[in-house]
From Swiss-Prot:
GO terms for biological process: entry receptor-mediated virion attachment to host cell; fusion of virus membrane with host endosome membrane. InterPro entries: PH_Rhabdo_glycop, Rhabdo_glycop_CD, Rhabdo_glycop_FD. It comes from the Viruses. It is found in: Virion membrane. It comes from Rabies virus (strain HEP-Flury). This is Glycoprotein.
Length: 524
């Protein structure tokens, strides 16, 4: 039921046709950009493809294939062979009777075969009695023939039912197949001219036990049905579907290869010959569950990003990437141009390889051409790097770290405070903070020097400067006092002429610096 979709997508249905979930979705059609405010942002519902505006969901029941359905459905049946037993008796002169038995076939009738089968299954003794040889009749000196018709039932005889045309396949049929069973003709001819094959159940359709009833949500717009959310929570689009009968039941073959029987008012073409449906097994159901879980996880991440935007009242290119539609269909695209939040209607398509949307350096393909950027900004968090490469947040490459750094540094406030009821304005005619955010920093215009210190750092620097200045003043005052000492003091000190003895390393006593110097030079 899923080669590999969605749609999810896309999704599934989209290439949520399974086995290969799209690595990315990008608009193939992008409407004009219009400015919006922060509270206009919203997370897309990736579990429903907003296809052509069909967002009205209503509960309904539909029929799909059972898990374990296989292309060759086993149908139990039986063969019925008509046998005529002939007993020929001859009675001679003395009364001896000679009996000779002979058998031959006849073409049985379906009604008689059905009755014989019912006798056999019910253990009715009439079936066993019907197989006995006829009780011979005799007449003196005459030959008498007695015949008895019997129906030999052999069961089970298993055949394969083709669900597409309800034909039966078995080696017991001429050419290996039988397509003659209808309401009025409930048997098949076999390789034996006097043997017919019949299904155990008179209604062959009940042998085609491959359907199950499920509950889902129909996505519609007015009388038009665009798709539905199946029982596992995955959206399936009816775009491109065609009518196909399985076991005589009319249904729709979807683009992802699944089959459903549901009522729609739209005219749908018949599928071309040879159009088959995919196997519905536990693996396909598990893939659908995994895709749904991934889409739910991505929606939670989007809601977290949206909550962060509303809390901080700011948005970044990286956060905008969470708001991208993850499955093909109609949605929104967001971007930031010249510090203005912009929105555009978009129709998303799935991307399987990055080369599809980045064919060359600096080119982001949208539709059939390279999409222009505005100051290095595209949309949905896609930007142009400093080296000219297109940077996509979800792209796993060596540029991812560089991309993350660029995106994280691009956080700017976008929600106008006039739209925020929690904004508190200043008294008087003082400039409001939200205005200053959009103006150049006047401090940087006054001085090109910026120490980068916080407020407390500035105070520490001022205190340290004051202490250094105080120490310098004390040092200067001390020097001035020494200079202003009386000359008498200096003369008295000079006339004293005291000798200072300093012990040398050799143990001798040196009386003055001059003696120490001359002695040291002598030793050297």
């Amino acid at each position: 039921m899923v080669p590999q979709v969605l749609l999810f997508a896309p999704l599934l249905v989209f290439p949520l046709c399974f086995g290969k979930f799209p690595i990315y979705t990008i608009p193939d059609k992008l409407g004009p950009w219009s400015p919006i405010d922060l509270h206009h942002l919203s997370c897309p519902n990736n579990l429903v493809v907003e296809d052509e505006g069909c967002t009205n969901l209503s509960g309904f029941s539909y029929m799909e294939l059972k898990v374990g359905y296989i292309s060759a459905i086993k149908v139990n049946g039986f063969t019925c062979t008509g046998v005529v037993t002939e007993a020929e008796t001859y009675t001679n002169f003395v009364g001896y009777v000679t009996t000779t038995f002979k058998r031959k076939h006849f073409r049985p009738t379906p009604d008689a075969c059905r009755a014989a089968y019912n006798w056999k299954m019910a253990g009715d003794p009439r079936y066993e009695e019907s197989l006995h040889n006829p009780y011979p009749d005799y007449h003196w000196l005459r030959t008498v023939k007695t015949t008895k018709e019997s129906l030999v039932i052999i069961s089970p005889s298993v055949t394969d039912l083709d669900p597409y045309d309800k034909s039966l396949h078995s080696r017991v049929f001429p050419g290996g197949n039988c397509s003659g069973i209808t309401v009025s003709s409930t048997y098949c001819s076999t390789n034996h001219d006097y043997t017919i094959w019949m299904p155990e159940n008179l209604r062959l359709g009940t042998s085609c036990d491959i359907f199950t009833h499920s509950r889902g949500k129909r996505a519609s717009k007015g009388d038009k049905t665009c798709g539905f959310v199946d029982e596992r929570g995955l959206y399936k689009s009816l775009k491109g579907a065609c009518k196909l009968k399985l076991c005589g039941v009319l249904g729709l073959r979807l683009m992802d290869g699944t089959w459903v029987a549901m009522q729609t008012s739209d005219e749908t073409k018949w599928c071309p010959p040879g159009q088959l449906v995919n196997l519905h097994d536990f693996r396909s159901d598990e893939i659908e569950h995994l895709v749904e879980e991934e889409l739910v996880k991505k929606r939670e991440e989007c809601l977290d990003a949206l909550e962060s935007i509303m809390t901080t009242k700011s948005v970044s290119f990286r956060r905008l990437s969470h708001l991208r539609k993850l499955v093909p269909g109609f949605g929104k695209a967001y971007t930031i141009f010249n510090k203005t939040l912009m929105e555009a209607d978009a129709h998303y398509k799935s991307v399987q390889t990055w080369n599809e949307i980045i064919p060359s350096k600096g080119c982001l393909r949208v539709g059939e051409r390279c999409h222009p950027h505005v100051n290095g900004v595209f949309f949905n968090g896609i930007i142009l790097g400093s080296d000219g490469h297109v940077l996509i947040p979800e792209m796993q490459s060596s540029l991812l770290q560089q991309h993350m750094e660029l995106l994280e540094s691009s956080v700017i406030p976008l929600m106008h405070p006039l739209a925020d009821p929690s904004t508190v304005f200043k008294d008087g005619d003082e400039v409001e903070d939200f205005v200053e955010v959009h103006l150049p920093d006047v401090h940087k215009q006054v001085s090109g020097v910026d120490l980068g210190l916080p407020k407390w750092g500035k105070y520490v620097l001022m205190i340290a400067g004051a202490l250094i200045a105080l120490m310098l003043i004390i040092f200067l005052m001390t020097c001035c006092r020494r200079v202003n000492r009386p000359e008498s003091t200096q003369s008295n000190l000079g006339g004293t002429g005291r000798n200072v003895s300093v012990p040398s390393q050799s143990g001798k006593v040196i009386s003055s610096w001059e003696s120490y110097k001359s002695g040291g030079e002598t030793r050297l």
